């Protein structure tokens, strides 16, 4: 499993949530849940209105960190509703890195 790509896909969804006006706490909670569903042994998520940071520890003991700077934010409740459903889908089905990347990139 390519954990870097998985992390990118999770971060893509978080970025789309932040750009759509989701609350920081809701984004953190969604990202925590997605990280947990992939079996990461540790995951730290930090969200502020212009930045998302995620550090994970893989089951192999590798530590990865990715950071995104978000420049534009608006409010789109329809997209947020879709992204929340998408987050639940990811947690329930843990799509592979290719599918997750396609899902996440479709909304960034």
Model-derived segments and their meaning:
Residues 1-95:
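Soluble N-terminal domains of membrane-associated systems
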Residues 106-108:
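Conserved small/polar residues in nucleotide/adenosyl-binding loops
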Residues 102-104:
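Short, compositionally biased segments
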């Amino acid at each position: 499993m390519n954990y870097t790509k998985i992390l990118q896909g999770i971060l893509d969804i978080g970025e789309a949530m932040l750009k759509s006006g989701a609350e920081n706490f809701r984004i953190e909670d969604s990202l925590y849940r997605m990280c947990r569903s992939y079996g990461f042994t540790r995951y730290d998520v930090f969200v502020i209105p212009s930045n998302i940071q995620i550090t994970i520890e893989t089951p192999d003991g590798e530590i990865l960190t990715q950071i995104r700077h978000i420049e534009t934010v608006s409010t789109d409740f329809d997209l947020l509703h879709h992204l929340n459903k998408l987050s639940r889908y990811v947690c329930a089905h843990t799509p592979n890195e290719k599918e997750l990347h396609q899902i996440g990139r479709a909304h960034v």
